[in-house]
Amino acid sequence: MSQNTPSLRELEHHNAFVERHIGPNDAEIAQMLDVVGHASLDAMTDAIVPAKIKSPAPLALPESMTEVQALAKIRAIADKNTVLRSFIGQGYYGTHTPNVILRNILENPAWYTAYTPYQAEISQGRMEALINFQTLCADLTGMEIANASLLDEATAAAEAMTLAKRSAKSKSDTFFVHDAVHPQTLELLRTRAEPMGIVLRVGTPAEALEAEAFGLLLQYPDTFGQVGDYKALVDAVHARGGLVAVATDLLALTLLAAPGEWGADIVVGNSQRFGVPFGFGGPHAAFMACRDAYKRSMPGRLIGVSIDAQGNPAYRLTLQTREQHIRREKATSNICTAQVLLAVMASMYAVYHGPEGLTRIARRTHRLASILAAALRNAGVQVGGDFFDTLHVTGVHADEIHAKARAAGYNLRAIDSDSVGISLDETTTRADIVAVAAVFGASLDVDALDASTADALPAGLLRQSAFLTHPVFNTHHSEHELLRYLRSLADKDLAMDRTMIPLGSCTMKLNATAEMIPVTWPEFSQIHPLVPADQALGYKELIDTLEAMLVECTGYDAVSLQPNSGAQGEYAGLLAIRAYHRSRGEGHRDICLIPDSAHGTNPASAQMCGMKVVVTKTDANGNVDVEDIRLNAEKYSDRLAAIMMTYPSTHGVFEEEVVEICEIIHKHGGQVYTDGANMNALVGVAKPGKWGSDVSHLNLHKTFCIPHGGGGPGVGPCAVKEHLAPFLPGKLGDNGPVGMVSAASFGSASILPISWMYIAMMGREGLRKATQVAQLNANYIAKRLAPHFKTLYTGRNGLVAHECILDVRPLEKTSGIGAEDVAKRLIDFGFHAPTLSFPVAGTLMVEPTESESLHELDRFIDAMIQIREEITAIEDGRLDREDNPLKNAPHTATAVTASEWTHAYPRELAAFPLASLKQSKYWPPVARVDNVYGDKNVMCACIPVDAYKDDEVEA
């Protein structure tokens, strides 16, 4: 082989994916390093990261795989799962995902790469979809308002419990739980209640009649399928000052009287059976609906209707002062990431089928269940009555039944030794009920029994009220119509398929197509979370190997993948610390130190664990004030439980004293919790588990490439050192000392292949390079913008970590232009704004990630420089201080093409501030949204059609 001939190994190009994932190529990296002032990535990293925390050796992970190799490897893992027909129920049901929704939402980056809709003007499409979801949930439950999704049904039930606690007139500390709620719901309630001083009492509805409690949770239909009449019970609870929460099934409510109609105050549930697969437990969009009186205490995101600057209807996140990122230690919930992508799917399932289609699916499911029940009874098998879709079969040898069922290709619910459950669903066929009947020794003539069998729903609980009457649910029933509706919504929004999203602390990096492909494979998507272990061997291998990968990346000793959001990972980590102290006879340790720059979820999670939050100071350079930490650690030495700190800090710098801080906390008996929100600055460079940290949560939807989905799904694994490992979240049936923090034992399991694929395709060297280029991109932006905008905080050598805070506060004094004006003006350039006013009010925090190319970085920089020039023009008097392109941003196509233009600047400056925008232009669908109007006039359901009537247009 000649000297110039590349080797076969080079030609195999094993690091091809690394080059696809990382935006700048090597030549561009060299060019950018020159701007930053360093000769190499390693030299730059040495100048950024404190030497005492740097990892001495490369990650002990395999080298990178190609996309083809990784897909083949994960296909082999998936094939170890066994897909049977699962009629287990217990909150999870088979469903058909309409292909138009599968392809155009779940597999469409216009939907799955979007961020939480904080910037209303560029999020109108997905907020309309979420308004549809809220309307769906409110209509079917008979409530006045519903939120834009929660993490899972069990979490929603726990949130209902705490909502009832703070809203009920009763002063009792007892929450009464129906003994026929789903088991996973009861386990999570136990986890959540004890640290908050809530006493759970579990019993029958009859026992609840006389109970003194601030709240009651009912399941309707219950976990065994029974449909109960609870009107008298609800009245009794109300008479004693309590509130009633109901966990329900949306499909059943197309046939059954809505809980709101018989007195419920709060209704929760799971929308999974509206087109979202099992996924071994998630992700699925739960919901909460409640009476209007409780809307300001309701957890989670809430989409409302306001008006824009031109008086047109516009959607926005409403009542945000309820949320954890604002209320912090006064919050009563730490919900942040929810399940927006799945809520969008469920809403469009309802839009596609409409009320008649949903009712038809429900009637067919109930009809099949009624026919099967009749066949079993005819064969002498005992079956409960008054059901929707679930049969409780008693008096059988359960082990024998399960063995026969599995041999026939079916999973039934394991209840006890002499009873089983059978939950039918949209996917059930005639052949299925014939086969299941045969398992019990029953024969079944479907047509004959159909003609002779009555429905099994109680006559007094049949739904009489209309639902989903809004035109959106009665229009898009052909595939063409839905396809075009989805396209029209996607076109209103900015997601990563169109532009960089430079949100600080959010890590909006590439969600590669190859990573997404396994998610919809039946071997992952069609596995019920409660199948026998031998049917989920592929999932076991996937979970075990991913946990090992994360252990290696973090330096910890054990990982739980159960938390289904970053906030839940925080909660799990703090519960582990709490349980550890209690195991050592130090349960009195209840003080949690939290810097004032911390994420809002940190203090919210701490108070949910029964801890008292003590806020520590930040110094003038943006660093955690070590002396203030030392003083507080000494002051609360006997009670110190933990410190929660983000590293690198939320101010975008690597603090030099992190090891010293860990030593201070440990000296006083506390544990160190390191928030993993900024792990994208660390992978392959430093490991928190090696510098003294005891526990972290990670964000797989940030660092490890699960897409944000417009506000979820997420996965927030909890990683711990060995001494905390026994206190990781328990699993259903094996609860452990802490209990469950999510409904499913492995959380949102079906999206774990995304992170597995990312790590496998990047390999040890690719992961380190990704971290370094993330640092480079942030510093390149900071250096290029330095003559125009000051970077508020830098670390040693004048460098930032992986994000930078641009300070626009001085400009507000000289021009009247604030950070929000800059954020809105960026929309005219086709950009999603950076993070606004966090962690410092009046600033913009920029995190470009490693995936953005030099071209895209320069496009953003050019936009920011042009904005600075416009601010200069205001300062100089060339642009009016009030009537200027920043104050009036964003500019809609309607505004700039109107026959009359009254502004003191030209239309071209409004629409095309840079010439390059004439080649490709994003037009926001609405002008600047009025936040004050939206909070004063709360409306959280579909907009009446007449609100869209056009004003008269001049000829």
Curated annotation (Swiss-Prot):
This enzyme catalyses:
N(6)-[(R)-lipoyl]-L-lysyl-[glycine-cleavage complex H protein] + glycine + H(+) = N(6)-[(R)-S(8)-aminomethyldihydrolipoyl]-L-lysyl-[glycine-cleavage complex H protein] + CO2
Q: Where N6-(pyridoxal phosphate)lysine occurs, residue numbers?
A: 702
Q: Per the UniProt entry, what is one GO biological process?
A: glycine decarboxylation via glycine cleavage system
The GO terms describing molecular function are:
glycine binding; glycine dehydrogenase (decarboxylating) activity; pyridoxal phosphate binding
Entries under Pfam families matching the protein: GcvP2_C, GDC-P
InterPro entries found in the cross-reference section: GcvP, GDC-P_C, GDC-P_N, GDC_P, PyrdxlP-dep_Trfase, PyrdxlP-dep_Trfase_major, PyrdxlP-dep_Trfase_small
Q: Which GO terms describe its cellular component?
A: cytosol; glycine cleavage complex
Enzyme nomenclature, EC number: 1.4.4.2
This protein's cofactor list reads: pyridoxal 5'-phosphate
Keywords for this protein: Oxidoreductase, Pyridoxal phosphate
What is this protein for, i.e. what is its function?
The glycine cleavage system catalyzes the degradation of glycine. The P protein binds the alpha-amino group of glycine through its pyridoxal phosphate cofactor; CO(2) is released and the remaining methylamine moiety is then transferred to the lipoamide cofactor of the H protein.
Recorded family membership: Belongs to the GcvP family.
- Subunit text: The glycine cleavage system is composed of four proteins: P, T, L and H.
Provide the protein name.
Glycine dehydrogenase (decarboxylating)
